[in-house]
């Protein structure tokens, strides 16, 4: 039982920071862009003073972090990694210098070494224009309905929020809904659409 639990925990481990030796261990089976993000994430744990000090204490004892604190630390390390990866506002400035559209984050993902998904999210969240990005999981076939797709992530720019408010998007869509009709069956993404 204990070895199964340890194996399951290790299978979820993508990266690990050893503060004492100043080493970061990363699962090499991951995609190279994910490895870069994980390295930056683990660097965040070591660079943010309150996290570094807390983890240094925990390495010396058998105590663990409260789950809520651990979740907060993980979110902070993710933010740190994103800010470093996209060089604070540099990505946003570069995007503003390019033509408006889906090709811009695709091109910038190569320049910044990020995944396309991360670049699209950053583009939607930080663009000066009204932009929304809706990411759905691959649709599941539903007999009699056609399919159902679950919303994984919604990102909207401040300009979108100012114009339309904080939209509550449906958690699931099917072909008979307005959003469901836009799901790109057999393709990775739909074309950009004006509002």
Regions found by a protein language model. Give the residues of each.
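Active-site hotspot residues in diverse enzymes, especially metal/ion-binding acidic/histidine motifs
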Residues: 1-195
């Amino acid at each position: 039982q204990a070895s199964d639990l340890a194996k399951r925990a290790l299978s979820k481990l993508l990266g690990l920071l050893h503060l004492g030796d100043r080493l970061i261990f990363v699962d090499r089976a991951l995609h190279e862009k994910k490895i870069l993000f994980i390295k930056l994430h683990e660097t965040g744990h070591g660079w943010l003073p309150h996290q570094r000090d807390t983890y240094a204490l925990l390495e010396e004892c058998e105590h663990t972090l409260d789950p809520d604190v651990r979740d907060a630390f993980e979110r902070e390390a993710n933010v740190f990694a994103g800010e470093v990866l996209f060089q604070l506002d540099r990505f946003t400035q570069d995007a503003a210098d390019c033509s408006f559209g889906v090709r811009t984050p695709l091109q910038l993902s190569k320049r910044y070494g990020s995944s396309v998904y991360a670049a699209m999210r950053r583009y939607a969240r930080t663009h000066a224009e009204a932009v929304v990005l809706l990411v759905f999981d691959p649709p599941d076939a539903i007999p009699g309905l056609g399919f159902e797709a679950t919303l994984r992530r919604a990102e909207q720019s401040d300009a979108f929020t100012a114009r339309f408010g904080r939209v509550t998007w449906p958690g699931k869509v099917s072909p008979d809904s307005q959003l469901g009709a836009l799901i790109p069956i057999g393709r990775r993404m739909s074309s950009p659409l004006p509002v």
